[in-house]
Amino acid sequence: MNDTTDIKHTSQLTSGDFTEAREPFALFEAWLAEATASEPNDPDAMALATADADGLPDLRMVLMKGFDARGFVFYSHIASAKGRELAANPKAALLFHWKSLRRQVRVRGPVTPVTDAEADAYFATRPRQAQIGAWASRQSRPLESRLAFEQAIAKEAAKYAIGAVPRPPGWSGWRITPLQFEFWHDRPFRLHDRIEFRRSALDVPWTKTRLYP
């Protein structure tokens, strides 16, 4: 393996010492803002890890569609693989990786469904074609052919040719409420910075720990 990529200039890394942060939400917000300014594609993309009832893990990329002190929100079909797994085991982990900044953030915690009002409000902001696609798709189910999918899309488009497209009853969102954050920043020669924030419950203060790289 070629390790020349390990030799990086300090000026490439960060502005300010993130290890001095006292709580994780403001730090994440600051890093996300920098990623939004510098990351060429989807700075809100995150890897979502779930596990089924047998404990077998699963992983996929999704888009974060909301973030505040309550947690991170994403949307999908309730009957999708992720939806079924979260119903059986309502815990998850997230990973944000911003290559242009040489940073990543890990998040772990329990998952709860968003309210119908939240799901309705977000669905109303989606492009019309995406709304129609949500009706046509049976996410994670076997599909006979691309043509069959396009025919289903055309059928739903005709059905909702006039007026607003309502949210499908089987389409909603989830919120992962963090009990753990880890902020990782690349440093030369693999001497990285890692800061972990943990709490045992939502009403317990955060404990910050610096970790060996």
UniProtKB/Swiss-Prot annotation:
Keyword hit for Chloroplast: no
Gene Ontology MF term list: FMN binding; pyridoxamine phosphate oxidase activity
InterPro entries for this protein: Pyridox_Oxase (IPR000659), Pyridox_Oxase_CS (IPR019740), Pyridox_Oxase_N (IPR011576), Pyridoxamine_oxidase_dimer_C (IPR019576), Split_barrel_FMN-bd (IPR012349)
Residues given in the record as FMN binding sites: 60-65, 75-76, 82, 104, 139-140, 184, 194
Residues that hold substrate according to the record: 65, 122, 126, 190-192
Superkingdom assignment: Bacteria
Pathway the protein contributes to: Cofactor metabolism; pyridoxal 5'-phosphate salvage; pyridoxal 5'-phosphate from pyridoxamine 5'-phosphate: step 1/1; Cofactor metabolism; pyridoxal 5'-phosphate salvage; pyridoxal 5'-phosphate from pyridoxine 5'-phosphate: step 1/1
Catalysed reactions, semicolon-separated: pyridoxamine 5'-phosphate + O2 + H2O = pyridoxal 5'-phosphate + H2O2 + NH4(+); pyridoxine 5'-phosphate + O2 = pyridoxal 5'-phosphate + H2O2
Disulfide bonds: none
Cofactor note: Binds 1 FMN per subunit.
Necessary cofactors: FMN
EC number: 1.4.3.5
GO biological process per UniProt: pyridoxine biosynthetic process
UniProt keyword annotations, A-Z: Flavoprotein, FMN, Oxidoreductase, Pyridoxine biosynthesis
Similarity field: Belongs to the pyridoxamine 5'-phosphate oxidase family.
Subunit structure: Homodimer.
PANTHER family assigned: PYRIDOXINE-5'-PHOSPHATE OXIDASE (PTHR10851:SF0), PYRIDOXINE-5-PHOSPHATE OXIDASE (PTHR10851)
Biological role: Catalyzes the oxidation of either pyridoxine 5'-phosphate (PNP) or pyridoxamine 5'-phosphate (PMP) into pyridoxal 5'-phosphate (PLP).
Protein name: Pyridoxine/pyridoxamine 5'-phosphate oxidase
Higher taxonomy: Bacteria, Pseudomonadati, Pseudomonadota, Alphaproteobacteria, Hyphomicrobiales
